[in-house]
């Protein structure tokens, strides 16, 4: 076990005094790291996530290299879907491809439930390796949100307009709600197992929910999100972060959820979120494209985010989306160091 652990991110969420604004980066573990790219010459994503020693190594790298205040488990949001009967393949340059998309209620009924100890022991073993050995910051576990998982399962892969997903919602509510309920059950078990293995925070990625308007979110998604988060919190008092992209119109709906942290993409500033009435700890939200700019531009864009965060008093610095593969590791190291220095109390 680690002594003198850096719990800055947990203190920030609890409203306790911190020495600086905590920082971590979505997709910090993986594609921007030379060590990871070398591994990918030999192993696929699923190969790495199925080998706890390799997965723990990749998860730990950014903490060592960038001095982040949290680690996020290296895995894919598709991980819990394979065991329940989803034939998923990660294709380079495309993303997840589903070979047996959901079309009918019978397709939903064919899905099995997840038993994390039996079906994803490698995920739990990775967490145990990290938390029982030398990780000196909290570990973030995660899951995809029901809508985002369902959209992949219905569309058969990434989509620009989610026509098949919306068509199912509007045309076949029975199938839609059956799928939502099944995915909530899977997610609760999956997330709970991660916490029991040692994860100290959970992030829910609802990457594509911005495709819905407020009315549809309230009818088709919100009750299921409330159930998912509430059932996890009934079992363990773990902080929950929610993040989505292009969904500023849903901010007030998210603020109603029993989450602890609301992640902002780069389109909505911290001040704007406050003006909209958000009361949660805020996470974000540098445009990841800025990391490809010269350092003077990066610093110029960092300062207002950090100033607004310090004024708000409850802020975790992050990007407004994941790290691009083209970002230089030294840039991430400099950003992390700048956040720590600039916000030092």
Swiss-Prot record:
Pathway: Porphyrin-containing compound metabolism; protoporphyrin-IX biosynthesis; coproporphyrinogen-III from 5-aminolevulinate: step 4/4. InterPro entries: UROD/MetE-like_sf (IPR038071), Uroporphyrinogen_deCO2ase_HemE (IPR006361), Uroporphyrinogen_deCOase (IPR000257). Its EC number is 4.1.1.37. Keywords: Cytoplasm, Decarboxylase, Lyase, Porphyrin biosynthesis. Substrate binds at residues 27-31, 46, 76, 152, 207, 321. It is found in: Cytoplasm. It comes from the Bacteria. One of its GO terms (biological process) is protoporphyrinogen IX biosynthetic process. The record marks 76 as: Transition state stabilizer. GO terms for molecular function: uroporphyrinogen decarboxylase activity. GO terms for cellular component: cytosol. PROSITE patterns: UROD_1 (PS00906), UROD_2 (PS00907). It catalyses: uroporphyrinogen III + 4 H(+) = coproporphyrinogen III + 4 CO2. Belongs to the uroporphyrinogen decarboxylase family. Catalyzes the decarboxylation of four acetate groups of uroporphyrinogen-III to yield coproporphyrinogen-III. HAMAP family: URO_D (MF_00218). Homodimer. This is Uroporphyrinogen decarboxylase. It comes from Staphylococcus aureus (strain MRSA252). The lineage of its organism: Bacteria, Bacillati, Bacillota, Bacilli, Bacillales.
